[in-house]
């Protein structure tokens, strides 16, 4: 076997399908189409400035964020790779304000695809790791154009969640609800090869990731948690922690899947009109599915994230995930949250980070 005895993505999907005698193979075909889009995006990312794809596209998305040239290209690659096969009924993308209606010449399938075509694209010009995130749900009305409300399904109904990471090597990490598995792209064969089966997140960790520049907007429970971590071995936790921040959800997730940790992008008061920063349907939900299937925990900070009922296709949400002990601790701090601002036992009202006067 040219892959050194390791399964390819195609072989893996066939084996998974054999566990379900009634399966038609359409889900496998859709995942294969998604994986092709990820290969194409990986190639564009790898060529970077040589391909003339860096910089701004001169437009903004529905979130009000500046679109990078690669955002637009990656979105097109996802649409073109998946719209034609008759496996998907409709799609939602971070880069499109409304759900995507398939061209009339293409058959409608059984599934809904939701994706962020290029997560972390603000990093692309400085050559920091980026990725793509996707979620697949069953269409409530298969074989026809979906209604807007059909996309508003909780994460518990997902049949597949995954991401591709474009780093020193390109990897595809996915779950079908039976463990989380990572495939590495063999650039010579052009095949995804199963390199990390059944990933497991350690229950304990000494590493956390949060954007500390938002500390003045944090809720008391988050301030308490971060203060205790940064107080280290002399504080109430009695151990030293390391803090990370990459500003790429895919990169943060990958690190946690590979070696543990906890990630926080919590709800805060920076923009009272937003319940969080990350998008529920095509960022937080698929990542939560992967994390739970790897033995970790994913939460809004207060409850299991996969149980949240979406209200809008671009809904934002607070997101905490990773090693179970730390996520459970953060949820407990929110349950114990006092009605008055938290006073750090070490640093007073300001916490470890001094607030601007």
Swiss-Prot record:
Gene Ontology CC annotations of this record: cytosol
Pathway of action: Carbohydrate biosynthesis; Calvin cycle
Domain of life where this protein originates: Bacteria
Molecular-function annotations in GO: fructose 1,6-bisphosphate 1-phosphatase activity; magnesium ion binding
Family: Belongs to the FBPase class 1 family.
The protein, known as: Fructose-1,6-bisphosphatase class 1 3
Organism: Methylibium petroleiphilum (strain ATCC BAA-1232 / LMG 22953 / PM1)
Catalytic activity: beta-D-fructose 1,6-bisphosphate + H2O = beta-D-fructose 6-phosphate + phosphate
CDD domains: FBPase
InterPro entries in the record: FBPase_C_dom, FBPase_class-1, FBPase_N, FBPtase, Fructose_bisphosphatase_AS
Gene Ontology biological process terms, A to Z: fructose 1,6-bisphosphate metabolic process; fructose 6-phosphate metabolic process; fructose metabolic process; gluconeogenesis; reductive pentose-phosphate cycle; sucrose biosynthetic process
Names of the cofactor(s): Mg(2+)
Record-listed E.C. numbers: 3.1.3.11
Keywords from the named record: Calvin cycle, Carbohydrate metabolism, Cytoplasm, Hydrolase, Magnesium, Metal-binding
């Amino acid at each position: 076997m040219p892959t050194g005895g390791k399964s390819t993505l195609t072989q893996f999907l066939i084996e998974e399908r054999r566990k379900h005698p009634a399966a038609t193979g359409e889900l496998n075909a859709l995942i294969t189409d998604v994986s092709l889009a990820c290969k194409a995006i990986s190639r564009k990312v790898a060529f970077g400035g040589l391909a003339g794809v860096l910089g701004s596209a001169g437009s903004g998305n529905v979130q009000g964020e500046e679109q990078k040239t690669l955002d637009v290209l990656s979105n097109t690659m996802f649409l073109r790779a998946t719209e034609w096969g008759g496996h998907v009924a409709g799609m939602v993308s971070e880069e499109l304000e409304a759900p995507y209606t398939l061209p009339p010449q293409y058959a409608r399938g059984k599934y809904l695809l939701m994706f962020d075509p290029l997560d972390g694209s603000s990093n692309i010009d400085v050559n920091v790791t980026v990725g793509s995130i996707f979620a697949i749900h069953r269409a409530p009305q298969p074989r026809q154009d979906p209604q807007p409300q059909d996309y508003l399904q909780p994460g518990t109904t997902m049949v597949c969640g995954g991401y591709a990471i474009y780093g020193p090597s390109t990897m595809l990490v996915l779950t079908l609800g039976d463990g989380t598995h990572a495939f590495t792209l063999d650039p010579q064969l052009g095949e995804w090869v199963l390199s990390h089966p059944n990933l497991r997140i350690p229950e304990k960790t000494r590493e956390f990731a949060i954007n500390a520049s938002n500390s003045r907007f944090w809720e008391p429970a988050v301030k308490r948690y971060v203060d205790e971590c940064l107080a280290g071995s002399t504080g109430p936790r009695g151990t030293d922690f390391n803090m990370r921040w990459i500003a790429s959800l895919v990169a943060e997730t990958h690190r946690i899947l590979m070696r543990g940790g906890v990630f926080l992008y919590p709800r805060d008061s920076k923009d009272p009109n937003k319940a969080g920063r990350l998008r529920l349907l095509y960022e937080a939900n698929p990542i939560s599915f992967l994390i739970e299937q790897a033995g970790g925990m994913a939460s809004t900070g207060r409850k299991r994230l996969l149980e949240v009922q979406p209200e809008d296709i671009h809904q934002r949400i607070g997101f905490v995930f990773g090693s179970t002990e730390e996520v459970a601790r953060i949820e407990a701090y929110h349950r114990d949250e006092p009605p008055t601002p938290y006073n750090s036992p070490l640093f007073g009202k300001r916490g470890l980070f001094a607030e601007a006067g």
